[in-house]
């Protein structure tokens, strides 16, 4: 049977064996075509014999005789005699095909008879459906049934368009004896009355490998007792799996075929059998489908590090369709797990794959039905690309540090780091040394090696190392690690720096540190020995001597040396590693003058005449050089000339002959010069013997004159000459006639005296000119010396701050700079150099103006003299004793009230122009405006000229404009050509109007002036506004800047002067040299205005002269305007401000100069073993205010003790952020302080890490002060009382504050969490979005973070978030363990970054000083202070 016919089989057949009763009821029914009584033979009924069987049925007719035994029934019927045929042969009789769409009952008679009672064979009934092949019999009977007819029914249902044909088949058995007969076949057009039958059995379709279930539903009487089975077309029986009664006339039977395959595909039918017969269903087909499978593997379209793009190639398949699902199955070829994704498109992108990994990809196809998924298709084996490395090794450690090599260890570079199986690791390093020497290099290394050595490094040098991990797709650089190489022996002392200064018996040797110290110099060793001498008596073969100097002593005095002797010095430096190579120098001591015998008390005169005197000459002893000559000098005695004392004296260095002495008027002459060989032993010599000795004439002495006779010994070596002399005799005048020398040997004395006189006059004139020049140069040098010594004086002041003031008189007496090195060693050079060179330094880096005079512009009185800058600290401390009695006394000595006429200001028409009736302009110094036409009184404005430092009328002090004077104010600005306005008040203070707003926010017209605000720069303590000023009728646009200081409190004076000093410097830098006066005003134009002007003037004076004269400056200002500097508190504040400026100096560095300046700042001074950066930090510590107990009174209250982590790190009362939200009995105190940023006051809140009992207070602080950022700089550590104070997910309530975690992400060293918080006591205020930045890059045991770059990135991330939230107005909370060093460093760097953006300068000192003014423990360690500089440099280099 073909598949189509079998699938459409609609007939249900039921067969029942009846009892051998005659059919009674059937005759009453309606007959249909197909029945036959065989009276006229089978042909008449359209019955046919099968053409393909073995033999045929035989027709027995009642009208014809037959051969049958007599016991056979009478009548007409069809019969088969089995004895005539072989066993197994079959005869088939075919009924007509039935097509009616109806239910039929086929009723017939049959018998199987054998005379011997044997089995005649089998009667089968077959049904052919739609002319298909024959199936197995649907009913059969076999064996002997007797000679009586039996009746049977067959119930059949036919459904159009199907048809069926019933076939009676007689099969001969092995007995071959008997007869098989059928008769009286009736086809009824209604169901059988007693025959059970099956409903239509449907086809079953399953996928290969699944279970197939056929369900047969049977109806009829007693059907529940039937036996059931499923019969395959080939006869295989399958037992019933389950039966279920539907009702009393119907039941269902299930048949299950396990895990079918294609071989199980066939036709199946249900068979039921009871005591009355059997029932058989139609054939239903079991259809087995093969699940589909792709023929080709997927095709690769694209590849990346974490994805693969494929085309499924699922159109060509093996198996059966339709395809209802496509899936991609993939796995790592090195792994066992698989993952499957459903696909709805012809292409698919596999995401989240591992880089550089081989994957096997297959396609799965699914058809309908259970088990419809076929086997995976052929695999595509491919590999992803490499990805950029995840990071560099975190555990970069130094395994070994030597002087010239560093061994580096790092963690194993696993795939999770490299993201590629092919990668390179490079170590790059660079370093800077002195003398602008630097080196940078990169070394490739074995990736599998756990250690690498960097060689050829300089000793004791900070080497910056970083690791670079590279693969084909990218690279990752580690943060730089700075390692200092070990010390080594130092290099040689520079030859050029080695200098020796010779004396007769000592040598002063000085040198400089080796160019390559290779560490910290611990000492210098100098060995020396004599190698030759001009004095033969000096031994030169002795052993060398050795001396040692400390590291900071680069000079030495070698005493007790031999004159005229050359010494060889070998000097070498030492570190902890030992001595380096030596540097040699030869230095020769000066020769000494010969030593003459002592003539004191000895009469050397042997004989004396009127014209001669004979003396005893004794030989001298050479000292350092042999005697070159002996000389006899004759000095004429004059009555008015002081006699020389006997013994050692100034010798006569210039040899003068008798002739030259007579012609030149010299008081002495050389009578003789004797070679040393002429005086081996004492010998007499006659002075005046009229002989010549070595070119010197020894003339007879004049009898009437007295003479002193001197004996000189001279040594001379290599242009060095030393002379020793002694008076050995005196010859008195006699009464004998004067012996006139030979005229031939004389010259005209008159002519010579005249020449000498003229020369003397010329010399005197020249001397006067030189004196005038020197005096003028000294006056000009006065200012330079004052400026040059300022920094030295500042150093003394800073050092003095931590000393006791018990003996202030010794402060300068012990100044080591006041005693030179030569003085300490009793050196007396022949020509003293009185000029001193001082280091040039700046007190204030601002523009200066040249001036003619050098005197102070103020009259310094005897009772109030100017104070040296170096004495200022001592002076202020003295004045502050006894409750500042000194300041009180000084201030009260000022004249209070009106000191000059102010008639113009008092006029009625000007009264409205004065804010206060008692602070108005003096007539003599008032600013006179050019009158407006037709208004003669319009020349008045309440303003006075004030002289600056050596600049007349450099300032204009004025009141804060009132509404009536705004136009006058701008007239004054235009008339005076002022470029800067300084405003030292707020518009309203304590509810009172202090100044009318005289400027526009955009553009405003005041009379004939148009003022436009073009720029506004708000800063924490002041605002800079830039205006353009235009006047009707003038083709000119001027720029005017207003500097508005907002940091002056409503009462008193600023707590510190740092902000005001920065403000003053900014004004100085902004005021053009050619501009007119600086206009300064507060409210009245007296108190704060006076403070500003006095500080500005005194800072100029301190720089120019090294002194300050505050008292007389205030006095001078009060002569120009009434009550300038209005309170004693302001007067003291001026002193404190100038002291702070002098101590701190100018620390701002322009961006363009920062890198070079910074490297200079960190360079170690070999003399002091310190650096400028270290000194700056010490200065910062010295000027940091110390908090007293009364400053922190609220934090010290007993109820607040348990809210403080450390009782020595408390916030001052003036900086406390008091909590607003009420939380039961809890106080409004929290250990936190408000801090200014660069642009915004109180922008930072610095606090300690919340304690377990202050977590609720912390969240109250966040909400009450609108904090949109939380910066966390330490770790959660329960052992230190640092709990997790936030919810990791979901929502938690902390007192009245509800905190909900919205998201959490990580970026490098920062975990970012966004919280949404609300105040449950004030829900109408809505939510506040807060982002927490938890910084992970700062180990608890380190003073500074491990990476400059990551810390800078943190600051910039916070800054960006702040700009996005709350229109940039939200505050930032920064906390670390104690709310000090780490938090301060974050704030300081944030200020510096803003400073660079706004002003292009770097001023770390000012940033930290500003923070410490509020809380002294900001930036605690020198490492943190230097790190601020390092990050500033990192920011400049990266931007």
UniProtKB/Swiss-Prot annotation:
Compartments it resides in: Cell junction, Adherens junction; Cell membrane
Q: Where is the Tyrosine-protein phosphatase domain?
A: 887-1141, 1173-1435
**What is the protein's species of origin?**
Homo sapiens (Human)
Give the family, as the similarity comment puts it.
Belongs to the protein-tyrosine phosphatase family. Receptor class 2B subfamily.
Q: Give the first-level EC class, as a single word.
A: hydrolase
Q: Where does substrate bind?
A: 1050, 1082-1088, 1126
UniProt domain MAM: residue ranges: 31-194
Q: How does it sit in the membrane?
A: Single-pass type I membrane protein
The tissues in which it is expressed are: High levels in lung, brain and colon; less in liver, pancreas, stomach, kidney, placenta and mammary carcinoma.
Recorded GO MF terms: beta-catenin binding; gamma-catenin binding; protein kinase binding; protein tyrosine phosphatase activity; transmembrane receptor protein tyrosine phosphatase activity
SMART domains, sorted: FN3, IG, MAM, PTPc, PTPc_motif
Name of the protein: Receptor-type tyrosine-protein phosphatase kappa
Q: Does the keyword Transmembrane helix apply?
A: yes
Question: What does UniProt give as the signal peptide span?
Answer: 1-26
